C-alpha cells in the first residue's frame, strides 16, 4: 500500500486515512467518490476505469505536493480504483489532514478537481443499451506518455 496509488481491489478507507494522521493534525477530511446508479436520467449498470498507472500515480503524488505548497502542514493520501466497479463501489478516496479544518476541506476539494484535470484515468459508463467513454480520455494518454 502506498500513499498515492492506483488499485484494482476494493478501497479500504481506514488505511489511507492513517497515512495523514500525526500529532500536529487537528482535522482529517476523507472524501470517497462512489459509483452512482443514475446519471442524467440514464441508469448505469457499472463503470469500467482504466489508467496509465505509472503516470497516474506520479500525478496523484504531484497533487499531494501541490496541496502541501498551497496549504502548508497538510498531509494527503489519494487512491483511485480501476477495473470494473459496481454501483456504490468506491472509485476514489482522498484523505487530507491539516492543523485546522478549513485547509483540510479546501485541499480535499482541490484534489478531486485536479484529479479530473491531470490524472490519466479513463471511465467507461456501461448501460443496459450501450456504453460510452466519459471524461478526458482523448489526449491525456498521449500526453502522459510524452511526460514519462
Swiss-Prot record:
Keywords: Molybdenum cofactor biosynthesis, Transferase. Pathway: Cofactor biosynthesis; molybdopterin biosynthesis. Belongs to the MoaE family. Its EC number is 2.8.1.12. The gene is moaE. Substrate binds at residues 34-36, 44, 100-101, 116, 123-125. This is Molybdopterin synthase catalytic subunit. It holds the Pfam family MoaE. Heterotetramer of 2 MoaD subunits and 2 MoaE subunits. Also stable as homodimer. The enzyme changes between these two forms during catalysis. Converts molybdopterin precursor Z into molybdopterin. This requires the incorporation of two sulfur atoms into precursor Z to generate a dithiolene group. The sulfur is provided by MoaD. It comes from the Bacteria. It catalyses: 2 [molybdopterin-synthase sulfur-carrier protein]-C-terminal-Gly-aminoethanethioate + cyclic pyranopterin phosphate + H2O = molybdopterin + 2 [molybdopterin-synthase sulfur-carrier protein]-C-terminal Gly-Gly + 2 H(+). InterPro entries: MoaE_sf, Mopterin_biosynth_MoaE. The keyword Iron does not apply. GO terms for biological process: Mo-molybdopterin cofactor biosynthetic process. One of its GO terms (molecular function) is molybdopterin synthase activity.
Amino acid at each position: 500500500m502506498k500513499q498515492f496509488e492506483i488499485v484494482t481491489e476494493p478501497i479500504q478507507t481506514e488505511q489511507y486515512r492513517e497515512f495523514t494522521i500525526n500529532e500536529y493534525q487537528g482535522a482529517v477530511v476523507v472524501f470517497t467518490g462512489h459509483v452512482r446508479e443514475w446519471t442524467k436520467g440514464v441508469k448505469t449498470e457499472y463503470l469500467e476505469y482504466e489508467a496509465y498507472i505509472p503516470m497516474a500515480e506520479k500525478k496523484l503524488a504531484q497533487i499531494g505536493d501541490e496541496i502541501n505548497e498551497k496549504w502548508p502542514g497538510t498531509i494527503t493520501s489519494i487512491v483511485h480504483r480501476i477495473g470494473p466497479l459496481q454501483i456504490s463501489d468506491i472509485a476514489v478516496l482522498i484523505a487530507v489532514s491539516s492543523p485546522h479544518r478549513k485547509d483540510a476541506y479546501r485541499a480535499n476539494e482541490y484534489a478531486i478537481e485536479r484529479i479530473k484535470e491531470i490524472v490519466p484515468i479513463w471511465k467507461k459508463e456501461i448501460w443496459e443499451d450501450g456504453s460510452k467513454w466519459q471524461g478526458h480520455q482523448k489526449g491525456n494518454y498521449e500526453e502522459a506518455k510524452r511526460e514519462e
